[in-house]
């Protein structure tokens, strides 16, 4: 029997934390969550970047991951992203990074967001299982974007690949079980929308590439 979904608001909805005001701003969305059964662990999903969806107006992606989590008997969903910059399309985020890079600044630092890594760690502390769902778009198409790595300016596509590996390694170091809904032909974890939300055990029955590394 399904537990009735509990909808919380404002900073309580986002779980508080040291900097609750940074979980949701006009420019960034660091974390969005729904908890409906506090007796079960929630599922952490890490996508590419957030849309303009809010706690009051969920988008199709968030509705889909909620359905998948409920059908896999999790107690809730915490949605985070590699990049916290809010945009309806990933190109919005990449164009913002390009504009910053044109001024000889770190375009990646801008779209990742100053509090994103801290929020990923804080969210991971609440879960056992993490699903990566950032697709190919997170690691491709970063032309004319520059990032700073070890005090060296590097190209966009190189930085993007190194950064997603860093986040994966971070979740491993925190002892999390790593999954994906499926992988793309390029080997990246697929976005949740192509998948049937009614399929039971969709997450836990998939032997993931991340588990084998």
Per-region residue spans from a language model:
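Conserved alpha-helical elements of sugar-nucleotide-dependent glycosyltransferases
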Residues: 57-64, 163-166
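Active-site and ligand/interface coordination hotspots across diverse enzymes
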Residues: 1-59, 71
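Structural motif
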Residues: 42-44, 76, 129-131
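Short amphipathic alpha-helices and their capping/turn segments at secondary-structure boundaries
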Residues: 31-37, 60-77, 120-126
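Short, well-ordered beta-to-alpha junction loops that form the rim of enzyme active sites
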Residues: 47-48, 82, 134-136
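Short connector loops at secondary-structure junctions
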Residues: 75-94
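Glycine/proline-rich loop-helix segments at beta-alpha junctions forming the active-site rim
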Residues: 93-213
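Feature marks short, surface-exposed loop/turn motifs that line or immediately flank catalytic pockets
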Residues: 52, 86, 138
């Amino acid at each position: 029997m399904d537990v009735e979904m509990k909808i919380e608001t404002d900073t309580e909805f986002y779980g508080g934390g040291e900097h609750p005001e940074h979980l949701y701003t006009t420019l960034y969305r660091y974390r969005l969550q729904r908890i409906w059964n506090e007796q079960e662990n929630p599922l952490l999903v890490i996508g590419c970047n957030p849309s303009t969806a809010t706690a009051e107006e969920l988008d199709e992606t968030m509705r889909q991951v909620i359905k998948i989590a409920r059908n896999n008997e999790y107690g809730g969903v915490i949605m985070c992203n590699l990049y916290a910059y809010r945009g309806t399309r990933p190109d919005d985020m990449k164009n913002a990074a390009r504009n910053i890079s044109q001024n000889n600044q770190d375009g990646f630092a801008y779209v990742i967001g100053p509090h994103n890594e801290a929020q990923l760690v804080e969210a991971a502390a609440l879960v056992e299982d993490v699903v990566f769902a950032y697709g190919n778009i997170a690691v491709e198409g970063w032309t004319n974007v520059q990032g700073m790595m070890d005090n060296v300016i590097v190209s966009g596509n190189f930085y993007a690949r190194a950064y997603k590996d860093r986040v994966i390694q971070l979740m491993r170091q925190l002892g999390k079980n790593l999954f994906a809904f499926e992988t793309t032909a390029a080997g990246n974890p697929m976005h949740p929308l192509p998948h049937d939300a009614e399929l039971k055990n969709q997450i836990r029955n998939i032997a993931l590439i991340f588990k084998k590394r």
